[in-house]
Amino acid sequence: MENMNDKWKKIALEAVPFLLLWAAFFVFGLWLRRQIPLDVPPGELHGLDYNGHGELFADHRLITFTRFRHPLFGWLMSPIPLFGARIANVSFIAYWGYLSFIFSGIVAASVWMVYRISAQMEGVGKVSAAVCAGLFACFGYVRYLAAGPESFSVSMLLALAVLWWGVRSPFVVGRQPLQGKGVYDKLVWFLLFVVATGITLTQGAKVVLAYLVSRRMTKRDWICLASGAAAAVLAAVGFYVVKLMLLGSGGRTVSSAFADLFSCIPHDLTIVQRLRMLEMFFFEPIVPHGVPYSVSEIVVAYSSWWQYALCAAIYLATAVGAYRMRSTLLVKMIVVMFCVDAVIHLVMFWGMSEAQIYCGHWFYVLPILIAGAWKKGVIKKPSDML
């Protein structure tokens, strides 16, 4: 009984910084709620443009939370929706300021966590660990500016939760299950599931899949089987979502809706144009959500050869690190969830923007995998690194 009390006391002490951080967000949200001009039309940007895509930004980024991805997203993003405020009426500057406040706190903690993880890997010195943490900060910053105030704060919160859980639990980073199968691990899994589900239902499904893989399916054959099964299920869900988006309340049939969707895809393309589309699909970093890829604009595109070279170098280092760490459960879960993301984006006609390992939901694994390229990723002390 005494040990259980000590465990709960430890959990409570570790949760205090996160609770204080959320309390700060809550108070700031109360203040910001008083600054919202409620007479502004939804999506109005007050004449501000966003990299030449102000119309897209107004329609996509500042729309009401209930129409964006998942209703829980609004609750996780800020306390504003709890007080009946319409996020569509938040001015661009006020909304950006709020996310900047979240960014400054969470990214600092996340970068520190990345440094501690990398520094504990065999063969990775403190300087190299600092480089990995710097890479994390750079990519997080790029994601923040490139994608705009969409889901960065919650993605950072999810990244921090994964890192915190991964560091504290020897089950994730170790080769075999060790300790930590009790209440503590279950609690962190549950919190991670809540946060992920708040982003999208598919993110929550991927957390459940990762839990099953890490607990029961440790062989590579089972990994492939789980990836295929999950991809099939999520593909079906994806088509169902597309159907709902297209049908709406107009009473159209499913066949006519899909006919309209596929009619948007150009078929009279040359070989060069098809190769260009393939290149854009896999290598352009940002594609607007909810818009068929074949008819959407690219918000961020590479303009110089060295940017593509840097991208290729990062891909190579990440692949080498993943291969060298292929026996760890962490990499196995990443592979499974990456496969699921790829299927989702293929089905939904989005680019591979979030499915790419260096962007979106995946950028936080970069420093760990790149560190693994230096030395095979074996954590010395997976527990008690905080």
Please tell me what each predicted stretch does.
Residues 24-30, 224-310:
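Membrane-lumen/periplasm interface segments of specific transmembrane helices
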Residues 28-56, 64-80:
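Extracytoplasmic catalytic/substrate-binding loops of multi-pass membrane glycan-assembly enzymes
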Residues 101-122, 317-321:
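Transmembrane-helix motifs of polytopic, lipid-linked glycan transferases
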Residues 113, 288-293, 304-328:
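Hydrophobic, aromatic-rich transmembrane alpha-helices
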Residues 114-138, 332:
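Transmembrane-helix signature of polytopic, membrane-embedded enzymes
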Residues 144-152:
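Short acidic/glycine- and proline-prone juxtamembrane loop motifs at membrane-interface regions
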Residues 154-174, 185, 365-369:
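Specific aromatic-rich, kink-prone transmembrane helix
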Residues 179-216:
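Membrane-interface alpha helices of multi-pass inner-membrane proteins
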